Amino acid sequence: MNIIFFGPNGSGKGTQGSILKDKYKIAHIESGAIFRDNIKGGTDLGMKAKAYIDKGDLVPDEITIPMILDRLKQDDCAKGWLLDGFPRNKVQAEKLDASLKKEKMKLDIIIEMLLDRQIAKDRIMGRRLCENDNNHPNNIFIDAIKPNGDKCRVCGGALSSRADDQDETAIDKRHSIYYNDVDGTLAAAYYFRDLAKKDDSIKYITLEGKNALPDVTKELVSKL
């Protein structure tokens, strides 16, 4: 089961990806982690990517896509993989599709999390971190994980928020890229949607991201 997962920051995409990883024993691959692992490991591609990152430049697709393909060939991907965070635009979608076909790597499922942009923004700004345990999710805008006042709903620990979660300009910039359906990330998703219309072996799934986490998971599993 090979999956590409699309969804804006704040949609719960990462959480659902982790659930699929555990349920189906597939690798959950985040594009950012690929860069970090290659740079930390000192690979040729990692060092090339680092040179661009250090200058504040975007890493070219000619470096990024081979890194992704190398990751998809690792042993933990034998039962399948879920790619999260790439492609981010239509051009990357086209290049990734061509590269997967060249490597004879089958793409089975595309998942798109649907979520209103303002709700996504509110969810990001509503995140709170438990100072006792980062694995205790708290969010002032999500009833299921709403804090107890200013304390962690799980352990009663003190809460704080990340600076970048409160940076409206940065959030708006990321969402402008994602919600761009002409050449941004949604355009990448729609490229694969159109591909699925012509290829019955590829399934395109949409999920209502505004629903409660268990309901989203139930909907997702029922559609796979």
From Swiss-Prot:
Question: Keyword set for this entry?
Answer: ATP-binding, Cytoplasm, Kinase, Nucleotide biosynthesis, Nucleotide-binding, Transferase
**Iron in keyword set:** no
Q: Where in the cell is it found?
A: Cytoplasm
Catalysed reaction, written as an equation: AMP + ATP = 2 ADP
Report the GO terms under cellular component: cytoplasm
Class of enzymatic activity (EC top level)? transferase
In terms of superkingdom, the source organism counts as Bacteria
Where do the record's region annotations for NMP lie?
30-59
To which pathway does this protein belong?
Purine metabolism; AMP biosynthesis via salvage pathway; AMP from ADP: step 1/1
PROSITE patterns from the xrefs? ADENYLATE_KINASE (PS00113)
Gene Ontology biological process:
AMP salvage
- Output the HAMAP family linked to this UniProt entry: Adenylate_kinase_Adk
Q: What does this protein do?
A: Catalyzes the reversible transfer of the terminal phosphate group between ATP and AMP. Plays an important role in cellular energy homeostasis and in adenine nucleotide metabolism.
NCBIfam families the UniProt entry points to: adk, PRK14529.1
- By what name is this protein known? Adenylate kinase
